[in-house]
């Protein structure tokens, strides 16, 4: 769990929007019911290999909540770390891209920190291109969230602008599901330039080096 406030005793819904501004790509997360800003996403490059890191910021305080970093150079693996640090002790999960050249149903395997088995705690499955994806507990467990991509106009799609509607079940870590939504966007739209988020938060996290600590 990232923070207690991101676990609700009732189902919740969010809108994740990626737009391109003069500063580059900007991702924003809003509560579907109230329209209130929940998170903003800053994209930076990390280390000498220029790997991507996506920093999920609290919209009110601009405090880093979760940092999603690429691990390795094949764009197939990400790790999520609480806050803006790089300590393995703060890692929340590792996500591994399981698709080949064609979608086969399972998009991501997600291993929570402490899971040293080959069995994922969660999977993201469905079809990105059809705009319907589900987050389920691993091993054929129950669905905990739905990620849907809105069908926008052709000009928006060609420019890489997307809107996702995310429905999350009760007692599910919203920050984890929202981070997976950002990863799903990144794995299918690897065109985000290094930029500041829409709040003009500085890219001070870019000096960190990234390494793989996972057994997966």
Where is each model-derived feature located?
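Low-complexity or membrane-interfacial segments used for flexible interactions
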Residues: 1-53, 59-64, 73-76, 83-216
């Amino acid at each position: 769990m990232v923070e207690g406030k991101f676990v609700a005793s009732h189902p919740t819904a969010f809108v994740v929007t990626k737009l391109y501004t003069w500063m580059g790509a900007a991702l924003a997360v809003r509560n579907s019911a109230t329209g209130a800003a929940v998170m903003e996403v800053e994209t930076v490059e990390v280390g000498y290999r220029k790997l991507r890191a996506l920093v999920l910021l609290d919209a009110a305080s601009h405090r880093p909540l979760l940092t999603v970093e690429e691990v390795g150079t094949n764009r197939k693996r990400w790790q999520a770390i609480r806050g803006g640090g790089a300590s393995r002790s703060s890692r929340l999960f590792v996500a591994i891209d399981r698709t080949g050249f064609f979608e086969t149903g399972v998009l991501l395997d997600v291993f929570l920190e402490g899971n040293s088995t080959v069995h994922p705690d969660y999977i993201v499955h469905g079809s990105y291109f059809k705009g319907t994806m589900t987050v389920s507990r691993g091993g054929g467990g129950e669905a905990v969230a739905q990620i849907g991509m809105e069908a926008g106009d052709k000009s928006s799609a060609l420019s890489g602008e997307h809107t996702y509607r995310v429905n999350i079940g009760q007692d599910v870590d919203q920050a984890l599901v929202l981070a997976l939504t950002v990863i799903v966007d990144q794995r299918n739209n690897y065109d985000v330039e290094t930029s500041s988020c829409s709040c003009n938060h500085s890219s001070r996290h870019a000096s960190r080096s990234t390494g793989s600590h996972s057994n997966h």
